[in-house]
Regions:
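GHKL/Bergerat-fold ATPase module
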Residues: 1-214
Length: 214
């Protein structure tokens, strides 16, 4: 292939951050040792010499992570559309080596915790973090019921109208996208609510019409 016009830095050194890596950040450094796959890190344990090189890759990635997170902390209020850049899709289980699986589980957890504590969700006239608020999102069980184009739209409108009576919710136009983002961090996150919880809260609420309940 003709590589003219492409910076040599991007030709000779691995680039982390493809659509298969697991998040919407590109990590690039000439300090990375080349790996067989450019969309991840692999940590072999059988060869000590090779292992030391791959361990350096994790150190570089951890350092870059701190840099990106510091930038996010400093500019959280100025960054728009967080919902489009904060989802995680790491496939921690496809790696052969347990040490690699463990690393990416930890890496995902680090980013999940970070995003949960960052003021990134627009709520009214302010930005809030998920951890420091009582904001709620739909569980994946509910989201899956919205797939039918016609029935799903009617169900969504009714369920959102019911949920917002007793819960703090993001805007109707963003609730599905944000629900998917939060589930990508943790499918069991306590901010994700299901039909049973919505119905239970409504049932305990005074002055709720039967049309809302049913």
């Amino acid at each position: 292939k003709n590589l003219s016009g492409i910076a040599k830095l991007f030709v000779y050194f691995p680039l982390l951050g493809t659509e298969n890596f697991g998040m919407d950040v590109i990590f690039h450094s000439k300090k990375f040792f080349p790996v067989e796959e450019r969309n991840g890190l692999h940590l072999p344990v059988s060869n000590a010499n090779v292992r030391s090189k791959y361990e350096q890759n994790t150190q570089v990635l951890d350092s870059l992570t701190e840099m990106v997170q510091q930038y996010y902390r400093e500019h959280a209020e100025n960054i728009t559309n967080w919902v489009n850049i904060s989802g995680l899709s790491f496939d921690c289980e496809h790696h052969k080596e347990d040490v690699t699986k463990d690393y990416f589980r930890t890496f995902k957890k680090k980013w999940s915790n970070f995003f949960q504590n960052l003021p990134m969700v627009d709520f009214g006239d302010r930005r809030i973090s998920i951890t420091e608020s009582d904001i709620r999102f739909f569980s994946q069980e509910i989201i899956s019921d919205f797939t039918d184009e016609k029935a799903g739209e009617v169900y969504f409108e009714a369920l959102y109208d019911a949920a917002i009576v007793t819960n703090s919710m993001v805007a109707r136009s963003e609730i599905i996208a944000w629900s998917n983002v939060v589930a990508s961090w943790d499918e069991l996150h306590p901010s994700l609510i299901g039909v049973e919880e919505i119905a239970k809260k409504l049932g305990a609420c005074d002055n709720v019409s039967k049309s809302t309940l049913y």
